[in-house]
C-alpha cells in the first residue's frame, strides 16, 4: 500500500504496542533522554503561565502524540510538580490540572492508561488534583474547543507527516526515489523539495489548529527530530532510513520483497532544520518564538562496549517506532528477517558507531489578539 493519503497513514502510524521486547514501552530510552534534556523548557513554560494573569482555577494541558511509553508520565509529573511549587509560592487554594493525552487511533491507549499509577497523577486530595483523559485523533486538525488549552506539549511527533510527500512519481508513473525510502545523496532535487513542501503544509496545519485551541498567551513546548546542517541528505539526519532501505533492498535481491514495493514507498517523516522550523512559525504568524535550540545526543546504546550488543539494542529501538508502518507496506511475515538484516548492516557498515541524533526544542507563545 502506497502511503499517498493522510487517511492511510493515520491507520498505520503508531508505535509497537504492548510491553514485549519489541514494544515502544520497552524501547523508548532515547526519547526519555531527549525529554530529560527538554524538561527545563517545560518547567519554564509552566512558570511563564503563572506569570501571565490567567486567574487559573484549572490548568488545561495536552500532550500530543503521546504514544504509550513512560515519557508521557514524566511530562504529567513535571507539570504537576511545577504547579505545586507555584501554588505554594503564591498561596493558591483550588488549582487543578486537566491533562489530555492524544495520539492516533492505532495508539496503544490500554498500555498507556495501565501505566497511569497514583505515583504519576497522585490523588484527588493533593494540593493540585490531576485529571487525565484520552483524546484519539490527528493533531494536524482540531482536537479541542476554541481557547481551551493553556499548555501544549509534544515530543518526537511533529516531524511525522500526514502522508508520503506528493509528486514522487513521474508523469509516466515511474518512481522518482527508486530504491530509497527517504531523502538520500542519490535522490533527485524534486524529492527534497517534495519532503520540505509536505512538512511545510503539515506543520502549518498543526499551528493553525493549535492557534484556535490555545488561549492568548498560552504556551507550546515542542520537541522534534531535526538536523543541524542545511543538507537534508546528510548522513547524520537520515542514517536510520538509509540503513533500513539497504536492508529492504537486500530482501528484494533475495526475492522476498517485490521491488516495486520498495520503489513506491517513502517514509512519511521529515527532519527539518532549525531555519526551516523558524521560517514556518514566522510565516504562520499565530505564535511568537520564545526559545529555539538544537542539540545532539548519542543514543544510550553507544554506552555498550560490544558492537553486536550496540547493534541489536539499536535495532530494537528502531523496530519499536518503524515496524507498524514498515510491516503494512512489506508484510508482517518478513519483519524478523528484515530487522535481523538491519542489525548486520548497522554492525558491518557502521561498526555500530552511530551518528549523533539532532533534536529541536521549540517554545512558542500564542499571540494575544
Swiss-Prot record:
Pathway: Alkaloid biosynthesis
EC numbers for this chain: 2.1.1.160
Binding positions (caffeine): 31, 156, 159-160, 225, 321
Broadest EC class assigned to this enzyme: transferase
Keyword Glycoprotein annotated: no
Effect of residue 317 to M: Enhanced theobromine synthase and caffeine synthase activities
Record keyword Magnesium present: yes
Domain of life: Eukaryota
Function: Involved in the biosynthesis of caffeine. Catalyzes the conversion of 7-methylxanthine (7mX) to theobromine and of theobromine to caffeine. Has 3-N- and 1-N-methylation activity.
Similarity annotation: Belongs to the methyltransferase superfamily. Type-7 methyltransferase family.
Protein name: 3,7-dimethylxanthine N-methyltransferase TCS1
Gene of this entry: TCS1
Amino acid at each position: 500500500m502506497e502511503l499517498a493519503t493522510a487517511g492511510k497513514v493515520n491507520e498505520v502510524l503508531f508505535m509497537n504496542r504492548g510491553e514485549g521486547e519489541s514494544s515502544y514501552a520497552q524501547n523508548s530510552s532515547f526519547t526519555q533522554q531527549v525529554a530529560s534534556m527538554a524538561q527545563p523548557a517545560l518547567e519554564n513554560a509552566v512558570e511563564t503561565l503563572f506569570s501571565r494573569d490567567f486567574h487559573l482555577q484549572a490548568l488545561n494541558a495536552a500532550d500530543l502524540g503521546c504514544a504509550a511509553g513512560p515519557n508521557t508520565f514524566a511530562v504529567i509529573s513535571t507539570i504537576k510538580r511545577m504547579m505545586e511549587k507555584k501554588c505554594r509560592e503564591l498561596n493558591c487554594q483550588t488549582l487543578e490540572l486537566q491533562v489530555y493525552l492524544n495520539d492516533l487511533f492505532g495508539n496503544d491507549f490500554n498500555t498507556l492508561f495501565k501505566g497511569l499509577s497514583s505515583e504519576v497523577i497522585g490523588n484527588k486530595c493533593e494540593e493540585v488534583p490531576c485529571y487525565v483523559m484520552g483524546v484519539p485523533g490527528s493533531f494536524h486538525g482540531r482536537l479541542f474547543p476554541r481557547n481551551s488549552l493553556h499548555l501544549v506539549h509534544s515530543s518526537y511527533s511533529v516531524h511525522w507527516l500526514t502522508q508520503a510527500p506528493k509528486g514522487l512519481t513521474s508523469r509516466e508513473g515511474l518512481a522518482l526515489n527508486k530504491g530509497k525510502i527517504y531523502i538520500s545523496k542519490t535522490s533527485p532535487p524534486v524529492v527534497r523539495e517534495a519532503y520540505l513542501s509536505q512538512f511545510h503544509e503539515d506543520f502549518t496545519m498543526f499551528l493553525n489548529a493549535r492557534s484556535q485551541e490555545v488561549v492568548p498567551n498560552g504556551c507550546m513546548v515542542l520537541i522534534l527530530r531535526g538536523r543541524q546542517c542545511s543538507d537534508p541528505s546528510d548522513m547524520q539526519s537520515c542514517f536510520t532510513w538509509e540503513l533500513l532501505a539497504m536492508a529492504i533492498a537486500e530482501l528484494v535481491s533475495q526475492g522476498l520483497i517485490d521491488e516495486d514495493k520498495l520503489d513506491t514507498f517513502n517514509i512519511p517523516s521529515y527532519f527539518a532544520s532549525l531555519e526551516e522550523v523558524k521560517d514556518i512559525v514566522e510565516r504562520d504568524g499565530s505564535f511568537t518564538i520564545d526559545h529555539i535550540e538544537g542539540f545532539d545526543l548519542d543514543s544510550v546504546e553507544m554506552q555498550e562496549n560490544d558492537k553486536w550488543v550496540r547493534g541489536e539494542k539499536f535495532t530494537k529501538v528502531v523496530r519499536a517506532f518503524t515496524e507498524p508502518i514498515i510491516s503494512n507496506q512489506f508484510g508482517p511475515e518478513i519483519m524478523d528477517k528484515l530487522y535481523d538484516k538491519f542489525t548486520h548492516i548497522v554492525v558491518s557498515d557502521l561498526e555500530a558507531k552511530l551518528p549523533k541524533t539532532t533534536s529541536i526544542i521549540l517554545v512558542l507563545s500564542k499571540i494575544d489578539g
